[in-house]
Amino acid sequence: ELFFIQLNILRTSNLRKLKLRGIVFPSVGDYFNTFYKEYLPFELTNAQKRVVREIRADMGSGRQMNRLLQGDVGSGKTLVALLSMLLAVDNHCQACMMAPTEILATQHYATVMGFLKDMDIKVALLTGSTKKKERNKILPAIASGEIQLVIGTHALIEETVVFSSLGLAIIDEQHRFGVEQRSRLWTKNAVVPHVLVMTATPIP
């Protein structure tokens, strides 16, 4: 009986590994290297460097990354998230960042655009307030892969949003989204994308 219990545990473990198989990001390419060497406005802290190395290792392992990025407001989480997104683009995938409010999504978009202003990367902002005319331009560009990075709110999980190849999904303040909302983001790709969750350090 114990043998069969162990066999069942092993089977469950193997099934879980199969389900968690992720997209392999084997290379660090021009987008990441160019930004890091030429456009990074300041030196990363040792903690940021360590986290970026760990994220690179996770996304190159063949297993789906599911990582929590925790830090105070202003600690540089968005920059680490951006470097992760550039790794996705270097490996011919798209990346998205979902925030719980339009204000926060707009702030992230402005920050990312500020960092990438001198680079040839297509970034879009998609929220509930995005005008229909603009939305009609953005959605086909996401579906074709022309838009590489998408930042938005719950609007990202609407059925009309179809990605060409979503490799990385970043969620800011995950606790403000429901389980169903988060899971709908995972289904935006045939293979479950890598997941990076950003959250502020809890106050003791």
Identify the meaning behind each predicted range.
Residues 1-96:
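Pre-Walker A segment
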Residues 92-96, 122, 145-149, 165-168, ...:
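Loop/turn-to-beta-strand initiation segments
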Residues 94-101, 126:
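Conserved RecA-like ASCE P-loop NTPase motor core of nucleic-acid helicases/translocases
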Residues 100, 107, 128, 154, ...:
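Conserved H-loop
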Residues 104-143:
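Conserved helix-turn-beta segment of the N-terminal RecA-like "Helicase ATP-binding" lobe
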Residues 106, 162-168, 174-204:
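Post-DEXD/H (motif II) to motif III coupling segment of the RecA-like Helicase ATP-binding lobe
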Residues 129-150, 157-166:
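Conserved motor-coupling elements within RecA-like helicase/translocase cores
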Residues 153-154, 172-173:
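Walker B catalytic acidic pair
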